[in-house]
Amino acid sequence: MPGIDKLPIEETLEDSPQTRSLLGVFEEDATAISNYMNQLYQAMHRIYDAQNELSAATHLTSKLLKEYEKQRFPLGGDDEVMSSTLQQFSKVIDELSSCHAVLSTQLADAMMFPITQFKERDLKEILTLKEVFQIASNDHDAAINRYSRLSKKRENDKVKYEVTEDVYTSRKKQHQTMMHYFCALNTLQYKKKIALLEPLLGYMQAQISFFKMGSENLNEQLEEFLANIGTSVQNVRREMDSDIETMQQTIEDLEVASDPLYVPDPDPTKFPVNRNLTRKAGYLNARNKTGLVSSTWDRQFYFTQGGNLMSQARGDVAGGLAMDIDNCSVMAVDCEDRRYCFQITSFDGKKSSILQAESKKDHEEWICTINNISKQIYLSENPEETAARVNQSALEAVTPSPSFQQRHESLRPAAGQSRPPTARTSSSGSLGSESTNLAALSLDSLVAPDTPIQFDIISPVCEDQPGQAKAFGQGGRRTNPFGESGGSTKSETEDSILHQLFIVRFLGSMEVKSDDHPDVVYETMRQILAARAIHNIFRMTESHLLVTCDCLKLIDPQTQVTRLTFPLPCVVLYATHQENKRLFGFVLRTSSGRSESNLSSVCYIFESNNEGEKICDSVGLAKQIALHAELDRRASEKQKEIERVKEKQQKELNKQKQIEKDLEEQSRLIAASSRPNQASSEGQFVVLSSSQSEESDLGEGGKKRESEA
């Protein structure tokens, strides 16, 4: 190495400008060394941090590979070959992790320690000495300046001694500090070379040691293992490429074949309806009620499984039972202005669901499939052939149910056509009960023969016009089977203390001959249910029944419009079915025609959600409350009448007392007028005014009238 530049320590006492200039060069060199070594320290520290991170990451990788066999993967989790291969890799990588850990330790000792010691000890020592030298130099200059200003004329031994002592102390301090400072700067020229070379030497030795350990660990067995793994990876890659090519071809074929199916409602000529299905799956919109008038439609995947209709929401692992469709009824319905809707009703009528298909084809296929399953065709040996024989009934279910007027006109007998004596008029809106064919015991004493049955609530009765009523029935009968009568526009239930709401479905109504025994309700239920079964009428109008102390109201769940109002005093009988407590009915007594004396009774039958007895109890409670309210009203009116009589008697008594008071006043005046006559006889005279004379005349007249009375 070339010679080392040095500062002359022997010239520190002289402190010449040349020495100071040379000191400035060494200080500039020290500053450059400090900046460069800081950058080199940061670079080596990054190497050390990276090596530590590599060691930790390698160890973590080995740990994760060991835990692979403990993982539970949904697919391919039981691959023993993969597990054993990863275990072997884990061992090799764990050995590499140990080598990296050794390398990290060597880098810390051989590379980071020397450069850190130079940075933290030697460079900081130079900075400290520089600051101390600067302070000592300033103090020496100040002492020399004070010594130079000593007065020649006015010498003061004490001041001179103090200044001289100050110069001595400051010069000594500067000299000593400067010598140590020069020594440190001269030593720095050696230390900077050591600080540069020693960390690099340690780094290279650590790397060589690391590579030697790696070479020792890499044996022939490991090379063979890596070669086998490379071959396996190439085989898997070739298999993947082949599978990708097959899937791409399948995608292209499916895109061409499925193009017409992208349309929501495909052409029925290209994709005809299959009416012989006994299994079906696909997405449907299900109607769910969220309130009295609100509802939501949820899209779910539905599929049939034997005699069950299953539903599965997106994200669910498995499907759940939506409805038992054995012996169920299915029909197309109109719901909330949506297309392709159909309703499924369970065999017992307790549960019903409204679903919406995506297309007309799906709509008809779902109805046909459910209709086939409901007849248990899927249990036969050849379900498709059996389903073909019942296709006609499925087609009838696809067509939406006609209205009451249409069904009535379609089923009305033609003019001049004879009918059996026991037959009754048959229609979906007005049908005969046909009791002779449906019951062994005739109850004509309760229900008149040939009585029409009303199955639909055609339209609500207008309640805004007083005295208005609708006439139903046949043969010119001007009756109101729903018991509607005119009333004021004020709500009848505003002040009612009882408000109970129930969900009911209207089954039918018919006129009855008696209203004094529950058998009337039972017989009406029997005839209406039998007529519905004969004519395959499954649709029921759902309403909300509001029970108050004034009336019973049927309210439309969708629009909250009152369909029918039954005055509570006209409800004379109510009862539930003896076996099926969901069925209940009541008899309404109304005036028939224009004559108030001609009364008729109509029985209404409803189905509820296991609340038949509760509804009857609520009606009974409403009638009791109404009865007590009527009694209280009558008692209040009677009390008011008594108070009016007492008030009238009190007024008469007060009037009589006033008359008596007036008579007493008149008598006093008459007595006063008789005193002057006595005084005149004694020679004294009293002059009466004209007013007093008039009062006396009035008093005499009053006495005359009293005596005459």
Curated annotation (Swiss-Prot):
Any GO BP annotation: insulin receptor signaling pathway
Motif (F&H): 403-414
Compartmental location: Early endosome membrane; Nucleus; Cytoplasm; Endosome
Required for RAB5A binding: region residues: 1-428
Bias kind Polar residues: ranges: 674-693
Chief place where the protein resides: membrane
Domain BAR: 3-268
Membrane topology: Peripheral membrane protein
Top-level division of the source organism's lineage: Eukaryota
Keyword Zinc: no
Region listing for Disordered, in residue ranges: 397-434, 467-491, 645-709
Documented effect of changing S410D: Decreased interaction with OCRL
Gene3D superfamilies: Arfaptin homology (AH) domain/BAR domain, Pleckstrin-homology domain (PH domain)/Phosphotyrosine-binding domain (PTB)
Residues where Phosphoserine is found: S401, S410, S693, S696
Coiled coil, from the record: 215-259, 621-673
Comp. bias intervals (Basic and acidic residues): 645-667, 700-709
Gene Ontology CC entries for this record: actin cytoskeleton; cytoplasm; cytoplasmic vesicle; cytosol; early endosome; early endosome membrane; early phagosome; endosome
Modification after translation: Phosphorylation at Ser-410 by PKA severely impairs binding to OCRL.
Keyword field: Cell cycle, Cell projection, Coiled coil, Cytoplasm, Cytoplasmic vesicle, Diabetes mellitus, Disease variant, Endosome, Membrane, Nucleus, Phosphoprotein
Tissue: High levels in heart, ovary, pancreas and skeletal muscle.
Protein's UniProt keywords contain Cytoplasm: yes
Disorder association: Maturity-onset diabetes of the young 14: A form of diabetes that is characterized by an autosomal dominant mode of inheritance, onset in childhood or early adulthood (usually before 25 years of age), a primary defect in insulin secretion and frequent insulin-independence at the beginning of the disease.
PANTHER family per the UniProt record, alphabetical: ADAPTOR PROTEIN, PHOSPHOTYROSINE INTERACTION, PH DOMAIN AND LEUCINE ZIPPER-CONTAINING 2, DCC-INTERACTING PROTEIN 13-ALPHA
Subunit composition and interactions: Homodimer. Binds RAB5A/Rab5 through an N-terminal domain. This interaction is essential for its recruitment to endosomal membranes as well as its role in cell proliferation. Binds DCC and the catalytic domain of the inactive form of AKT2 through its PID domain. Binds PIK3CA and subunits of the NuRD/MeCP1 complex. Interacts with OCRL and INPP5B. Interacts with NTRK2. Interacts with APPL2; interaction is independent of follicle stimulating hormone stimulation; interaction is decreased by adiponectin in a time-dependent manner. Forms a complex with APPL2 and RUVBL2.
Domain comment in the entry: Overexpression of an N-terminal domain (residues 1-319) or a C-terminal region (residues 273-709) has a proapoptotic effect.
Protein name, per record: DCC-interacting protein 13-alpha
Phylogenetic classification of the source organism: Eukaryota, Metazoa, Chordata, Craniata, Vertebrata
Gene from which this protein is expressed: APPL1
